[in-house]
Structure formats: C-alpha cells, structure tokens
Amino acid sequence: MILIVGGRGAGKREFAQKTLGCAPEKTLPDLQDREPLPSLEELLGYEAVICDEVGCGVVPVEPAQRARREAVGRLCCRLAERAERVERIFCGLPMVLKD
C-alpha cells in the first residue's frame, strides 16, 4: 500500500493515478473525510490511500473537530509505518518520505 499525503488540491489523486498508475477503484481518496474512519486493516487492502495533511494549519476551535483531526493523524502515522511507500505531494511535486 502507498500512502499519499499533502494539502487539499495539491495533486495527490492525479499523482496516484497518472504517475503511479493506481486504479481509481483500488485507491481510497479523502481519508480525512470518511465517517467513521476505516480500520487500519481495511486501509491496507487498498493500492493507495490518499489523505490531506491534518497536522499543519489552524487548529480547530471545536473539541470534536480537534479529536477528529487527532484520530486522522494517528491513523496516518500507523499507515505510514505499514506502507511500502509514503509520498508527500506539494504543488503537484512528489517528495518520497519512505521507499
């Protein structure tokens, strides 16, 4: 499984499909928007998992939003540990974090 992270609109989905050749049906986009969050085991079944970076930017005022952000961040950390490869996309440019 490949984990792809980056800011919203940074080109993560295009990178997964065009550069890496990941099939859309085997790619989970927008992990941060899934409710409830999928389990780690479920996510490991995808070819690629795409998530917005949630550790940067303005911290939400609402406790529930902060808790959600924390849960997404921790899940991404666990995914990164298990992923074969981790890429960060910034302005459409990939940076290999793990290979």
What are these regions, as identified by a protein language model?
Residues 1-26:
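Glycine-rich P-loop/Walker A and Walker A-like loops and their local beta1-loop-alpha1 context
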Residues 6, 30, 91:
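Active-site donor-binding loop signature of nucleotide-sugar glycosyltransferases
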Residues 19-39:
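Conserved substrate/cofactor phosphate-moiety recognition/catalytic segment
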